[in-house]
Amino acid sequence: MSKRLKILLTNDDGISAKGMSLLVSNLLKADFADLYVVAPSTEQSGKSMSFSYTQPVSIESVDYPQEVAGAWAVSGSPVDCVKLALGDLFYDSFPDLVLSGINHGSNAGRNIFYSGTAGAAMEAILSGVPSIAFSQEQHISFFQTDSAPELLRKLSFYALSNPFPVVTGFNVNFPASERNEPWKGMRLVATGKEFACGLPKLLSSDGKRKSFSLSDCQVVMDEDISEECRCLLDNYITVVPLLVRNSPLALTSESEFQQLQETFQEFMCSEADTRLFDV
């Protein structure tokens, strides 16, 4: 019998978020790992890789409504959660994998650079732990649970298979089907440039002072639509590799990427139930 994995779960929507509950419940159904939740006590969306540099941050053991091995709430950002988990809670025995999400809303395209969900995954990678960030387009209610346990299991073991000679992770986005159609499958793609968030919306102005909201999102597309965006529009789950080399996000060469796409398909087809996934 293979050993059970030790997985750290975090997010940026907060420890009580529906997306975290969905991630936990589907991992429990897959039953291949012991789960530890270390997540912000309040919503921390848009925090990217920020951490509490100028003020103290606290961590508190909490009761979680699902059967996890342990749960802690952190008074800080998603990166704070990963730093405290790896630097304190699991200092002597790192988790095998860090899973972040499931985010309420897309983190495809440009959103990845602002995302606290992706920021937590990147922090784990920088610390030497493979990681995956999960996000659901539009609204968390679009998340489909029928095939999710097997999908999460396969992606977890793929991240642990060392597809690159460096510690790696993935940014996974689930499409939103207005007609609730089943996901068509998975596609490993490069990061697109669509889906910009943070557009200024004027709330009030008194002549001297203006007040804005930066929570508006607008899909920005060129005529040359990215493969990531096209796949999501076609109801495919997108899997984008995150690599740490000399910069926070480093893309491979075209030939390396094509090779990665081939190995991704081979790995997923090696055990995957083709009735569930078209990879």
Curated annotation (Swiss-Prot):
Gene3D superfamilies for this protein: Survival protein SurE-like phosphatase/nucleotidase (3.40.1210.10)
Pfam families: SurE
Species: Chlamydia caviae (strain ATCC VR-813 / DSM 19441 / 03DC25 / GPIC) (Chlamydophila caviae)
Lineage: Bacteria, Pseudomonadati, Chlamydiota, Chlamydiia, Chlamydiales
Main localization category: cytoplasm
Catalytic reactions on record: a ribonucleoside 5'-phosphate + H2O = a ribonucleoside + phosphate
Cofactor: a divalent metal cation
Keywords: Cytoplasm, Hydrolase, Metal-binding, Nucleotide-binding
Keyword Metal-binding: yes
Function statement: Nucleotidase that shows phosphatase activity on nucleoside 5'-monophosphates.
Locations listed in the record: Cytoplasm
Protein name per UniProt: 5'-nucleotidase SurE 1
Superkingdom field: Bacteria
GO terms assigned for molecular function: 3'-nucleotidase activity; 5'-nucleotidase activity; exopolyphosphatase activity; metal ion binding; nucleotide binding
Top-level enzyme category: hydrolase
